[in-house]
Amino acid sequence: LSKADRLQRAAANLPVEKRLRTIEEMGRIWRRRWESGELDGVAERLAQSTGYSPEVIRLEMSFVAEVLDPEKMMKNLESTLRGGAASLEGMVPISDGENIRNHPCGPALVISSGNSLVPPFIPTITALATGNLTILKPSLSNYEAVLAVISTLEEAVKTTGAQEMLDLLVVSYFSHRSEVLDHLLTNARIGVVNYWGGDPGRGEVSAKVAMNPHMPRYFVNGPLTGFAVIDENSADEEAARGLAMNILLYDQQLCSSPTQAAFIGSMEAAKRFCAMVGSELDALGKGMAMGMSDDGAFILQCSRKYVQFAGGRVFSSNDTDNMWTITLSESVSDLDEASQSYGPLAFHNRRRFLEVIRVDDNERVIDLIGDLPDNNAYRGADKVQTIGLAVSAARKEALMPSLPSTGAYRIVPLEDMFMRSPLEPYDGMDMAKLFTYGVYQRDTSLGKEVLD
């Protein structure tokens, strides 16, 4: 940290094109290692440590190259930074006689989530591309895989000559009670802290950051969830398959994963659609074995019974490698009542578990999305991040004026809930802005006109 200013000044003189070329080379190296089988052992151990199926981990390992896509990063920088990517290199005109330059506000400390590999690199690559000295704290479960990605940077700079980027990155594992981590949060000269996760961790980190005399920025990517909206006219096999795939990916641990859905139409049509989704979960889930202990299977069966006692209809599978569950209720969430009676039914304990609520109109859909944080069955999720739509054009037009007011951050096609565009904010925030600050420069005087 004592060298942070010098290192960030050196990186500030590195052309953005060279920074992105280095990131591109990282992606090329990763892709080569992955396709050659060099990373098979890392993938196997990551599956064991995270509990995800080998098939899901293999998919995630292939996603790493997407995070290292220079064209996507350039689009993100151009669309989010005032003055565009060029403002990271020098002053850029924004009006006659007025200029702006975006500087890194680091050193940056990224405390990442531990349930997969890709999330740690979303803020880390952005922080590096914007010139921040970056300290990345992965979790014990993904530490080895994170180091495997970082090793591509070590090789990439030999080709691009961008040693400054390698000098900016530090990867360290700290326990939650680490004295070093405590020092970083409470006393170190840190410019920004990015925490991924929920309570109690984020509250503890927030309290410590508030004590830091250097007043670092603090922003959180908290636990969120997905909500699907389907109407009777769009309840076809394509919608069922898209919904099933988003349920299976990462066993609903993504912030975009659908955990609740509203079906607008008759109860009979809702039953048919739930059965269709179940068939797709059977077919697709066979290739993504989840695995479940006897204790876990017993708890899940009890959970299903409690939902039935609360009045819900249950569609389910008893295949221990693919134990999916769909509940269907009328107008209100039966899971709300059931989860109050049965603790193990809590939000973070559910995997491949979707609650479908049949409703009559658009207004009820809006209410369900906005009320989800107050539903006992979803305690642990701050709110809805992603709304996935499979509705008619007319219904979409009717819904769109109200959907943004629900607090959700993303409204996308149902089958595409897990995919991100480089142009979209991350949980409502432009991440490149969070790792930079704007320096404004003006050549002309404005005060004379006011004082005269």
Regions found by a protein language model. Give the residues of each.
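N-terminal Rossmann-like NAD(P)+-binding subdomain of aldehyde/semialdehyde dehydrogenases
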Residues: 1-100, 384
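Structural signal for terminal/edge beta-strands and the immediately following C-terminal loop/tail
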Residues: 425-452
